[in-house]
Amino acid sequence: MEAAMGPSPVIREYETIREVRGPLLIVEGISDAAYDEIVEVELPSGERRRGRVLETARGYAVVQVFEGTTGISVTGTKVRFLGRTLEIKVSDEMLGRVFNGLGDPIDGGPPITSGVRRDINGEPLNPAARAYPEDFIQTGISAIDGMNTMVRGQKLPIFSGSGLPHNKLAVQIARQATVRSGEEFAVVFAAIGVMYDEAIFFKRFFEETGAIKRAALFINLADEPASVRLITPRVALTLAEHLAFDLGMHVLVILTDMTNYCEALREISAAREEVPGRQGYPGYMYSDLASIYERAGRAHGRKGSITQMPILTMPNDDITHPIPDLTGYITEGQIVLSRELHNRGIYPPINVLMSLSRLMKEGIGPGKTREDHANVSDQLYTAYSRAVELRSLAAIVGEESLSEVDRKYLRFGEAFEQRFLKQGFYENRSIEETLDLAWEILSILPESELYKIKDEYIRKYHPKYRKKQSQSSGGK
């Protein structure tokens, strides 16, 4: 990681630390510190650490130390204000590499020497320059591609819970995600505050499957200072912006786990003795999250795009918790994982009735996926919703008390979960396979129940008619 900006910045050195408070230093006697300015802290032993200015006021500055404040004394420690913001050197050479949360290589490879320097805070896209997301990204996951389609430039989070397989789903999507042939595609994967075994899983999976060739991994461990967790997603997005807007690539950014990011935000806010908001989180958490999520998108006149898939674990599976609640306001939908489906052995355990992709309609249809996609998705939602209701009713009155059509809905619900939702970890379904499978399952229902689908699509894609067409062409 480098800090550089502007011609010959003035370096100021102080030895006036008033207080060490958690990951923060309170430095007195400085009046010209700038917000986000980079700081170098030199201990009496000669050890050097990096930090940045979090708050500045008349006569003092609050400095966040990236490597932590353990061992820092208020006497004999030098604090240098470098007059620069935090930047990293970014290049397409970073694809295929593994870095720590600050952007330093940790895979044994050489440092990144070529490329351009970019401020990790990025530059927000002018709203007038934004292009509306409208192109399909195939993840190979039927529940996403078929019913909650992800579109280039979208922000589509995954809401999970402790113990659910969100990490497994994240790496499967990272391995399988594709755009139209002939277009350059890359994955930037940032693991935030993860345990050591999770970090090993991510690194080993990408390397063993070959997915590392088109990906860059940023891994921030749980035992590292909380301040680094606030840097990691911004470092990852800085690389993504270079790949997308400088090199014209389509980039999928996966951020896991944003709950760890928010916990770090709360920890540092508490150390600064700020007035807490909901459940102790800082009142500015919404705008802070927006500064990350809003770095996704497409721009007029630029070929590339950034699509974000942030993953967060909902404390106590509470979707009204401040973290998923605020995330939902900023992003364009959500994929919700179900503990009930997970306990029944269904992977991925996506609760489609609670999930939503607000931009789906823009990314599907003729020339993008298939003409029947929207109708099939609507019919799946309608039929599965009824099946879930009838399942609850059957538990009370018994299945034999239901009508023949209702029993077919129960059969549909079971087939939907066991064949459509459920798929293998290495099973990569094309959008055609997903839609054809949906038709097979919908064919369990009477044709009169498929009222969300146009007649022309029924006669073209329904297995009954496709079989007749096949027999007819075979007879000729």
From Swiss-Prot:
InterPro entries: ATP-synt_VA_C, ATPase_a/bsu_AS, ATPase_F1/V1/A1_a/bsu_N, ATPase_F1/V1/A1_a/bsu_nucl-bd, P-loop_NTPase, V-ATPase_su_B/beta. It is found in: Cell membrane. The keyword NAD does not apply. Pfam families: ATP-synt_ab, ATP-synt_ab_N, ATP-synt_VA_C. Keywords: ATP synthesis, Cell membrane, Hydrogen ion transport, Ion transport, Membrane, Transport. GO terms for cellular component: plasma membrane. Its main location: membrane. One of its GO terms (molecular function) is proton-transporting ATP synthase activity, rotational mechanism. The keyword Repeat does not apply. Belongs to the ATPase alpha/beta chains family. PANTHER family: V-TYPE PROTON ATPASE SUBUNIT B (PTHR43389:SF4). Component of the A-type ATP synthase that produces ATP from ADP in the presence of a proton gradient across the membrane. The B chain is a regulatory subunit. Has multiple subunits with at least A(3), B(3), C, D, E, F, H, I and proteolipid K(x). This is A-type ATP synthase subunit B.
